[in-house]
């Protein structure tokens, strides 16, 4: 369904995603241009395919990150709050933070403690010279924590945007409960056969679901292996 391209730079990768029509929104394009995968992916960072980041985990293919930012952009406005479940390398946390800055909040949840520590280091290298994001980090409005993504966050809080980087057999009610009205969730659902779905909650709290395309993700309930998303 998709083709892998190994590009020479982050700018070339983003341009490829634009030309491939995965990216058309200017704010999403700007966020991906500002968030270099080289900080988050040590191997072939500019190839449009999943890559190993250690601990049996892969970083999503760039076109999947582009899809997430593109679809969630209406609820990734400055001042919005976002949750990334299965935050892995920390890449999408950083990209979403650039979209909700300066007054927004982004939280990542990852169930592998060692990967949380690695992702925090990745994030700090990326935002080291970004005063706005460093201020968000210092104020704990930009953070990555160890946790069970199926349960959302431990705090009683709600989010405008929720991205789920692992598959669920069905839509977790806990995540629906943590979604604001209006709000959007991007999540892969299914077991042997999976699709990416955009879940929307309107101002009255009514839920709708739109199918985007087939994918293959590791499940939320298990430790990841090499059969990652694409």
UniProtKB/Swiss-Prot annotation:
Record's subcellular location: Cytoplasm, Cytosol; Nucleus
Keyword entries, A-Z: Cytoplasm, Methyltransferase, Nucleus, S-adenosyl-L-methionine, Transferase
EC number: 2.1.1.77
CDD domains found in the cross-reference section: AdoMet_MTases (cd02440)
One BP term from GO: protein repair
Domain of life: Eukaryota
Disulfide bridges in this chain: none
Catalysed reactions, semicolon-separated: [protein]-L-isoaspartate + S-adenosyl-L-methionine = [protein]-L-isoaspartate alpha-methyl ester + S-adenosyl-L-homocysteine
Amino-acid positions noted as binding S-adenosyl-L-homocysteine in the UniProt annotation, renumbered to this chain: 57-60, 65, 89, 110-111, 148-149, 221
Signal peptide start and end residues: none
Gene Ontology CC, one term: cytosol
Record's function text: Initiates the repair of damaged proteins by catalyzing methyl esterification of L-isoaspartyl and D-aspartyl residues produced by spontaneous isomerization and racemization of L-aspartyl and L-asparaginyl residues in aging peptides and proteins.
Family indicated by similarity: Belongs to the methyltransferase superfamily. L-isoaspartyl/D-aspartyl protein methyltransferase family.
UniProt xrefs under NCBIfam families: pimt
Protein name: Probable protein-L-isoaspartate O-methyltransferase
Organism this protein belongs to: Schizosaccharomyces pombe (strain 972 / ATCC 24843) (Fission yeast)
